[in-house]
């Protein structure tokens, strides 16, 4: 930053991160991977600090998460373990209770691609939906937009007995045809053998318009009910 012209405008994304308390940021870039697997390249940005703890720039690493990393429990990463504690605290569950333990497991079922860039409140909403689906044996759908990165995340949780493999393909087609998803990564996992979780990470070619995901949760629910 010291070498930048005083009149050079600061990009909106950089400005927002300067005010953000986080030090590490994870994004999906707008460039496609040409190795390892199909999809958007991953980007990790780290704030660079001077001896007085002032931000003087960002370091950036671009690549793709390895299959091993994608299979890791999120709480095995220090930065995400700390966030898990904050998310569960925000839910207000009683430590040691069934709901508290369920919330911890629900967090660890979420994909790294969502947890690393997501805001705390968005993670809390998704974890709360998993807990609700488990305790009430019902279908829960939550969508989270990330306009800065032209992407969005969809969490679909339903009783395992109601889960069918065809749902993923049908939801993929819906996301592509009605919500302009150009690339879709999905993960399927099961919680306590009673709950199926299907998560979709979607990248778009153009900017997400305000209200772009309006109606999406109802549309997805209609497909799986």
Locate each region found by the language model.
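Non-catalytic interaction/regulatory segments
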Residues: 1-225
């Amino acid at each position: 930053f010291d070498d930048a012209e005083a009149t050079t405008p600061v990009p909106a994304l950089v400005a927002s991160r300067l005010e953000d308390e986080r030090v590490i940021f994870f994004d999906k870039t707008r460039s496609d991977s040409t190795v390892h697997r199909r999809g958007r390249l991953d980007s990790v940005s780290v704030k660079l600090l001077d001896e007085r703890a002032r931000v003087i720039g960002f370091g950036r690493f671009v690549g793709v998460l390895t299959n091993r990393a994608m299979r890791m429990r999120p709480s095995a990463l220090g930065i995400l373990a700390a966030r898990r504690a904050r998310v569960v605290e925000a839910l207000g569950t009683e430590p040691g209770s069934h709901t508290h333990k369920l919330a911890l497991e629900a967090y660890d079922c979420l994909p790294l691609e969502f947890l690393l860039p997501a805001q705390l409140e968005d993670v809390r909403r998704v974890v709360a939906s998993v807990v609700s689906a488990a305790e009430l044996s019902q279908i829960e759908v939550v969508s989270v937009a990330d306009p800065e990165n032209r992407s969005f995340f969809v969490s679909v949780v339903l009783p395992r007995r109601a889960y069918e493999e065809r749902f993923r393909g049908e939801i993929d087609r819906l996301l592509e045809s009605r919500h302009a998803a150009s690339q879709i990564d999905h993960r399927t996992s099961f919680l306590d053998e009673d709950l199926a979780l299907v998560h979709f990470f979607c990248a778009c070619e153009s900017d997400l318009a305000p209200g772009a995901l309006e109606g999406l949760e109802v549309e997805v629910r209609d497909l799986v009910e």
